Swiss-Prot record:
GO terms for cellular component: plasma membrane. Induction: Increases following spirochete infestation and decreases in response to engorgement, events that are temporally linked to B.burgdorferi entry into and egress from the vector. It is found in: Cell membrane. Glycosylated. It comes from Ixodes scapularis. Keywords: Cell membrane, Glycoprotein, Membrane. Serves as a receptor for ospA protein of B.burgdorferi, the Lyme disease agent. Required for spirochetal colonization. Essential for pathogen adherence to the vector. The keyword Hydrolase does not apply. This is Tick receptor for ospA. The gene is TROSPA. Interacts with ospA protein from B.burgdorferi. Specifically expressed in gut. Localizes predominantly in the intercellular spaces and luminal surface of the gut. In the gut, it localizes along tight junctions. Not expressed in salivary gland or hemolymph.
Length: 161
């Protein structure tokens, strides 16, 4: 009887953790999509000049390559979290990739550059939080199933003896 009560309490705890994870994942995905939209709007407003990649200095091209590598790492890390977060991260990476070759960093106002850096940091933080939440729930599920097995074994042992 005690084992059944413990099992019911664990089921309630796992359901609460799953609901929390869904809420965190959906809010992270919607916030990421919103930030990507804001980043695209800011980029289109603050980039009046359309420059070709040939007119960019070498340092700007290498900065572009570094940003592409950063965006690629972020989107590949988000792939394991969930489909919605992967889509939002892809939108954010696409915004950064399509924004960079159009003008040099000199033509961007300082506030726009710092806003872009803050957006990348917040997207990375949300992806890390979602990943941590998913791992926490996964561990909780493992413990729940182990406890369920032990409770069933204890009930069976008590009934058999």
């Amino acid at each position: 009887m005690v084992a059944m009560e413990a099992m019911a309490a664990m089921e309630v705890m796992v359901a609460a953790m799953a609901a929390t994870a869904d809420t965190v994942a959906s809010s992270a995905a919607s916030a990421t999509a919103t930030e990507a939209t804001v980043a695209m709007d800011t980029a289109s407003l603050s980039l009046p000049l359309q420059l070709s990649p040939r007119s960019l200095p070498q340092s700007s091209l290498s900065a572009t390559a570094a940003t592409v590598a950063t965006d690629t790492v972020v989107s590949s890390a988000d792939t394991e979290v969930s489909d919605t977060e992967d889509s939002a991260a892809t939108v954010s990476a696409t915004a950064s990739l399509s924004m960079l070759p159009q003008s040099s960093p000199r033509s961007l106002p300082q506030s726009s550059l710092s806003a872009t850096a803050a957006t990348v940091d917040s997207v990375t933080d949300m992806a890390d939080t979602a990943m941590d939440t998913k791992q926490f729930i996964s561990k909780g599920n493992e413990h729940f199933f182990a406890a369920s097995y032990l409770c069933a074994w204890a009930d069976q042992s008590a009934a058999g003896s």
